Swiss-Prot record:
Organism ancestry: Bacteria, Pseudomonadati, Pseudomonadota, Alphaproteobacteria, Rickettsiales
UniProt keyword annotation of Iron-sulfur present: no
Full protein name: Small ribosomal subunit protein uS3
Free-text function comment from the UniProt entry: Binds the lower part of the 30S subunit head. Binds mRNA in the 70S ribosome, positioning it for translation.
MF (Gene Ontology): mRNA binding; rRNA binding; structural constituent of ribosome
Annotated gene: rpsC
Family assignment from sequence similarity: Belongs to the universal ribosomal protein uS3 family.
Length: 218
């Protein structure tokens, strides 16, 4: 019987398409560091949900210093007026970690290729009661237009408010899930609607790992 694995975990590691999103050094208190990292991610995703955050990278080289890199489409929402919101975020993270906090905000230039952005956008549009078919097709068209080699989207739940839940999927291009060298990004989001929760899954195939590394060198 076939077993499903998260495409991101399947491709994370040295010489693979993805790297770890959290890097820390710990001896016996690894679980404490992990719990604090989860709290930091929850604070950022909750307080700045409208910033359309695509990725959060956390580097914790020592107990005294922590670096948080936030990638988002609307960086102004995170920074706030005169940097007031980002200072507040630093204070909240410092309370959790008891360390010196450095925050780097980076703007995503092509959000249509970011799996998290696509999933969040679809979920928000479903909450506004837009047609799930139009929303999914529009997202696929925008992603392919920006250079994606393939994209697959699945929405599950009471689509359109029907009584019986079902799943609808749309796909364009190639999404080779069994090819490890393929740089496939995966994200999941939930749309909280009046008739229930709708799950949104997104797979985006960008390129092969060799091609992506050549582009990084350039």
């Amino acid at each position: 019987m076939g077993q499903k694995v998260n495409p991101c975990i399947f491709r994370t590691g040295p010489n693979l398409p993805r790297n770890w999103e959290s890097v820390l050094y710990a001896k016996n208190n690894y679980s404490d560091f992990l719990l604090k990292i989860l709290k930091i991610r929850k604070i950022i995703n909750t307080e700045y949900s409208f910033a359309q955050i695509t990725k959060i990278l956390i580097e914790w080289p020592s107990s005294k210093n922590i670096v948080v890199n936030i990638y988002a489409k609307k960086i102004g929402v995170i920074i706030g007026k005169s940097g007031g919101d980002i200072e507040k975020l630093k204070q909240n993270i410092a309370k959790i970690t008891s360390a010196d906090v450095s925050i780097n905000i980076r703007e995503v230039k092509k959000p249509e290729l970011e799996e998290a952005f696509i999933a969040q956008t679809i979920a928000q549009q479903l909450e506004r009661r837009q047609s799930f078919k139009k929303v999914m097709k529009k997202a696929i068209h925008a992603s392919m237009k920006q250079g994606a080699k393939g994209i697959k989207i699945i929405c599950s739940g009471r689509l359109g408010g029907v009584e019986i839940a079902r799943s609808e999927s749309y796909k364009e291009g190639r999404v080779p899930l069994q090819t490890i060298r393929a740089d496939i990004r995966y994200a999941f989001a939930e749309a909280i609607t009046t008739y229930g929760v709708i799950g949104v899954k997104v797979w985006v195939y960008r390129c092969d790992v060799n091609q992506s590394r050549i582009n990084e060198v350039k």
